[in-house]
Swiss-Prot record:
The keyword Metal-binding applies. In pupae, expressed in imaginal disks and only in the male gonad. In adults; isoform 1 is the predominant form in the testes and is expressed at a low level in the ovary and somatic tissues, and isoform 2 is very weakly expressed and is detectable solely in the testes. PROSITE patterns: RHOGAP (PS50238), ZF_DAG_PE_1 (PS00479), ZF_DAG_PE_2 (PS50081). Signal peptide: none annotated. This is GTPase-activating protein RacGAP84C. Residues 147-330 form the Rho-GAP domain. Involved in the morphogenesis of the adult appendages. GTPase-activating protein for p21-Rac. Promotes the exchange of Rac-bound GDP by GTP. Pfam families: C1_1, RhoGAP. InterPro entries: C1-like_sf, PE/DAG-bd, Rho_GTPase_activation_prot, RhoGAP_dom. A zinc finger (Phorbol-ester/DAG-type) spans 86-136. It comes from Drosophila melanogaster.
Length: 384
């Protein structure tokens, strides 16, 4: 019952809002806890992983600057010898298109501080950056891919496509004790699906759950479907004549000159694959000798044009000589060059795509505005 002065009786006060006592109890309950650790999991806003990541973020940014720049900090571990280039990380919080960490495969939480490489599409947790074994492969130029090797290779040396680097790294990490690499085939559908995912290049793939034979078939299919083979037709004669010398030093000098005549993407990819196949030939558990590798990859490296028995035998002989070259010979072609300024800290991987879309949309808007004013001027002149 409400009195004349407008005040409510205690009996009616209980029926005003059934939610109010519950909120008061929660506030009283929260005031009883003095620290965040005393709260139960039900009342916590962040999990333990988020708190650790936020603490790492504070430790890496002691000055408290707003830019959150990570220049000069050593994130990547030097223990993994397969890394061709160190990642150039940038701290970023994602509010849309949130993905998974490349290393642990766990979800990067909404608005949580994480690391993203400026040169490649790699994203990971801050705590996982020192355990990464994924190579940093800068993305190729944005444009239509016509099937040439240079279309899939980065713009800086070593110009090896990301598909080959990621597959080779995973094969060497898990498959050097597995028999029949590059000899045992996989299903065509699995290989095709993996190749499309790797060539799309929108995110760094996780290949830990892929079969090693599928990875090997993906490498072979990629080399077979190139418009120009790894050793182009107009360079066959140079390699054939270089391997006919009897003196070992003469052969090495002639092969060196023949390799230098190749395009840089072909040269770097050939050197990278030779080092990989040499490791496979040296592993007794794989049971793939130099002769077996030459038989398998001779038609793939030289192309299927003029595929006669005599040419295949010649290509196998050339490939045997290339595989028997010392590892230091091929390592000299894989020198890591610094990234250009367009891929530096001020103009990174995602900014290239955003900048392109912004330019296209702004140009369309400006042309429409100019068209509108021109039409208005023409309309006014006709009425005059």
């Amino acid at each position: 019952m409400i009195s004349g002065s407008g005040s409510r009786t205690p009996s009616n006060r209980l029926y005003l809002s059934p939610v109010r006592p519950t909120m008061q109890n929660k506030r009283r309950l929260l005031r009883e806890y003095r620290s965040y650790d005393d709260l139960s999991e039900h009342y916590r806003m962040f999990g333990s992983q988020s708190l650790d990541s936020l603490q790492d973020r504070v430790d890496m940014n002691p000055s408290g600057c707003d830019g959150l720049s990570t220049d000069g900090l050593d994130f990547c571990s030097q223990s993994h010898s397969g890394l061709l280039r160190e990642h150039n990380f940038k701290i970023k919080s994602y509010y849309y298109n949130v993905g998974n960490c490349v290393h642990c495969r766990k979800r990067i939480r909404f608005a949580m501080a994480s690391l993203r490489c400026r040169a490649c599409p790699l994203r990971c947790h801050i705590g996982c950056c020192r355990q990464l074994t994924v190579n940093c492969i800068p993305q190729p130029q944005i444009g239509t891919k016509r099937g040439c090797l240079s279309d899939y290779a980065p713009r800086v040396a070593p110009m090896v496509p990301a598909l080959i680097v990621h597959c080779v790294t995973e094969i060497e990490a898990r498959g050097l004790q597995q028999e029949g690499l590059y000899r045992v085939s996989s299903t065509r559908e699995k290989c095709k699906r993996l190749r499309r995912k790797l060539l799309r290049g929108k995110s760094t793939p996780h290949l830990g759950n892929k079969d090693t034979h599928t990875l090997c078939c993906c490498v072979k299919d990629f080399l077979r479907q190139l418009v120009h083979p790894l050793i182009p037709i107009y360079h066959r004669r140079d390699f054939e004549e270089a391997t006919r010398h009897e003196d070992r030093l003469a052969v090495e000098m002639a092969v060196y000159l023949a390799v230098l005549e190749l395009h840089q993407a072909h040269r770097d990819t050939l050197a990278y694959l030779m080092l990989h196949w040499q490791k496979i030939a040296e592993s007794p558990a794989v049971r793939m000798t130099v002769n077996n590798l030459a038989v398998i990859f001779a038609p793939t490296l030289f192309g299927d044009l003029d595929l006669t028995l005599e040419n295949v035998v010649t290509w196998q002989r050339v490939l045997k000589v290339l595989l028997l070259m010392p590892a230091g010979f091929w390592s000299q072609f894989l020198e890591v060059h610094p990234l250009p300024t367009s891929l530096g800290s001020t103009y990174d991987f995602e900014d290239r795509y955003n900048h392109r879309h912004w330019d296209s949309s702004s140009n369309l808007g400006w042309s429409s505005v100019k068209t509108y004013f021109r039409s208005m001027v023409n309309l006014s002149s006709t009425h005059l």
